Amino acid sequence: MAHKKGQGASRNGRDSESKRLGMKVGAGQRVSTGSILVRQRGTKWHPSKNVGRGRDDTLFALIDGIVVTRKTDRTYISVLPE
């Protein structure tokens, strides 16, 4: 006889709620001051010109302008004035 019950469904079905991380605006889009550009854990994307970094590594715009991404050894996000 089996020493485990063959019930599956009632004991499964747990998962954590998604955290909605990632880019919130794409390159070339217009943003206003304080707009969230990226939600992330750690620094997958790094702040560059006119971009601030919050305590939870969220990147946000410091000025009104256009979002620009640049990839070297790291991916940088900046906001250029219009």
From Swiss-Prot:
Residues 1-51 are annotated as: Disordered. Coiled coil: none annotated. GO terms for molecular function: structural constituent of ribosome. It holds the Pfam family Ribosomal_L27. Signal peptide: none annotated. GO terms for cellular component: cytosolic large ribosomal subunit. Keywords: Ribonucleoprotein, Ribosomal protein. One of its GO terms (biological process) is translation. NCBIfam families: L27. Belongs to the bacterial ribosomal protein bL27 family. This is Large ribosomal subunit protein bL27. It comes from Chlamydia abortus (strain DSM 27085 / S26/3). The lineage of its organism: Bacteria, Pseudomonadati, Chlamydiota, Chlamydiia, Chlamydiales.
